[in-house]
Amino acid sequence: QKDFFLPSLNLKYNLSEKHSLRLGASKTYTLPQAKEISPYRYVGVNFNSQGNANLKPSDNYNVDLKWDFNPTPTELISLTAFYKLIKNPISRIEVASAGGYLSYENIADKATVAGVEVEVRKNLFVRPLSSAANGMNKLSFGLNGSYIYTNAKMPLATVTTGSQLEGAAPWIANFDLSHNFTKGNHSFINTLVFNYVSDKIYTIGTQGYQDIIEQGMMTLDFVSQAK
């Protein structure tokens, strides 16, 4: 049994009616998932895996600084810088064995995570209908993108000098274009959504094995809603 002391600090300073700064600092922890700590073998579609009962929880020390600009109540431009120190990070590894299976380890004493994130929500036009029609015609878009740097010196890894953390994609981007037509008690919303995630490490290679890379992907979806 382990006791956790988890302090948290959040500060906000309004530079003006439309500009604000936020500072956050906290300590959190990550417990191993059931499949990561269970000693039983799991048979998957692509890989078999087995948990590690000796895994330790990860301690996370987080700091972020955020600037918000609200041109209007429904619009936003935001920029965030963040840093995280992780003690005893948990990662999936490939075990050198005849059966070839994946397991989980506290892969390093510590790991660092740093990055920036930008978010934009903008109205391209907002046109009220006539007072008799009681409605609105609105076109808007949203953009969210981030770059994440991760690094850890891993004694168990094939490349011990430093590697990305498992599951952390360096580049992530999301974009949506939405048309909202409202008239009386009825509304029609059509949204085009684009998402991109870059290549990321699926499994960290050990004992001569190379890292297994999960290929990045792009998706494009169209969502229509009426009520």
For the regions a language model picked out, list residue spans one by one.
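Subset of outer-membrane beta-barrel
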Residues: 4, 62, 125-130, 183, ...
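Outer-membrane beta-barrel signature, preferentially recognizing the C-terminal barrel domain
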Residues: 29-86, 96-127, 168-171, 213-216
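Surface-exposed loop/interface segments of Gram-negative outer-membrane beta-barrel transport/assembly proteins
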Residues: 24, 34-36, 184-186
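Short, glycine/charged-rich beta-strand-loop motifs at protein surfaces that mediate ligand recognition
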Residues: 207-214, 221-225
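Gram-negative outer-membrane beta-barrel transporters
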Residues: 81-85, 102-200
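Outer-membrane beta-barrel translocator domains and adjoining extracellular loop/strand segments
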Residues: 1, 34-40, 47-48, 89-97, ...
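Membrane-embedded beta-strands that build the outer-membrane beta-barrel scaffold
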Residues: 7-15, 19-27, 63-71, 75-83, ...
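Conserved structured core elements
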Residues: 2-5, 13, 57, 110, ...
